[in-house]
């Protein structure tokens, strides 16, 4: 009973109701998504193919609804990427492979509707490559016919490939440009890091001297290194310098108080390391019992050479101006530990003129004239004493800025030991190492 009733309802409802709103419309997507004639013919074909699914009454109702609608009111689809909306886009004529692929795709899609479109395209491409010339000839002829027809239909046709609107370059170009930019950036970063390592690796450099030298003789690229990297390089450089100096178990000398403003940028940029043991040839015969020289690896190109004269009681620092070739002023400073332990009331500095190329002849008999500054009490003495006089290096650790003397001693006295300096050196100018 229920089956008969449902069948009668199915047969009665569409035929009896002529109101389009009450009519069941099984194909609304086909109706509303087919704006032009080609689409409409496809819809009719699909409707014909679906004749077996629906009974006759439903088909009649659908055709009545569709025929009563004016399809010219449906707007034409606007292409998203279309250049000018006034001109319809003219496609290129198909080549031989496109002719083959389109015909084969339609046939295969009808036979195997479950095939994925991408897999179908791959298979069609493989099959096309396997075809010989005789198999390809009909498709080539059809493509030539289509090309001639296209030429007649569109005599002014000019192939204009569309540009991508997102502004992205082609993948190959993008890779090449990114590689070039990355290479330039890495080279620039390597230059900056090596520059910082050269400067901070030397025991003489600290922050202020690095900045002043960088501003006066800066590299051609602007200093854009982040501050964190700069501080890291600074700490690494100081660590390296202290490691190279502290291998002998002695605290390193703080060369941050040495003025390096006169050192040229070329010398600083072309620094090379060398073996510290080369200094042994400059030691005097009686000085081998003393401490070896542990001044850092960059001292030769800086013009700073350290050697120890006559055991641990004297230490000489020779600073040479790299700009002058034949005549150079040598600023030397030698200080005796015993002077500070025995006479802490006056600060005494011993100045010795050293000819840098002639260390062997200059060191054995060094006279130490003493310059007394009676007006300066131990509060203004250059070094801390009595508590750090145990070792040679600790006796020369510099004091803080408030305790440094601000005087400069320049002496033209003939009592300075000139007998050991070579004849081609001028009268040396003696200054205490102080910062303005």
Swiss-Prot record:
InterPro entries: HMG_box_dom, HMG_box_dom_sf, Sox_N, SOX_TF. Sumoylated. Residues 48-88 are annotated as: Dimerization (DIM). GO terms for cellular component: cytoplasm; nucleus. Residues 145-159 have a biased composition (Basic and acidic residues). Keywords: Cytoplasm, Developmental protein, DNA-binding, Isopeptide bond, Nucleus, Transcription, Transcription regulation, Ubl conjugation, Wnt signaling pathway. Its main location: cytoplasm. This is Transcription factor Sox-10. GO terms for biological process: central nervous system myelination; melanocyte differentiation; neural crest formation; oligodendrocyte development; oligodendrocyte differentiation; positive regulation of DNA-templated transcription; Wnt signaling pathway. It is found in: Cytoplasm; Nucleus. GO terms for molecular function: DNA binding; DNA-binding transcription factor activity; enzyme binding. Residues 90-158 bind DNA. Residues 1-55, 145-183, 195-257, 322-346, 413-436 are annotated as: Disordered. It comes from Xenopus tropicalis (Western clawed frog). There is a cross-link at residues 44, 331 (Glycyl lysine isopeptide (Lys-Gly) (interchain with G-Cter in SUMO)). Residues 327-436 are annotated as: Transactivation domain (TAC). Transmembrane segments: none annotated. CDD domains: HMG-box_SoxE. The lineage of its organism: Eukaryota, Metazoa, Chordata, Craniata, Vertebrata. Interacts with the sumoylation factors ube2i/ubc9 and sumo1. The keyword DNA-binding applies. Acts early in neural crest formation, functioning redundantly with the other group E Sox factors sox8 and sox9 to induce neural crest progenitors. Acts downstream of wnt-signaling at the neural plate border. Involved in the specification of neural crest progenitors fated to form the pigment cell lineage. Residues 209-295 are annotated as: Transactivation domain (TAM). The transactivation domains TAM and TAC (for transactivation domain in the middle and at the C-terminus, respectively) are required to contact transcriptional coactivators and basal transcriptional machinery components and thereby induce gene transactivation. Residues 205-215, 331-346 have a biased composition (Polar residues). PANTHER family: SOX100B (PTHR45803), TRANSCRIPTION FACTOR SOX-10 (PTHR45803:SF6).
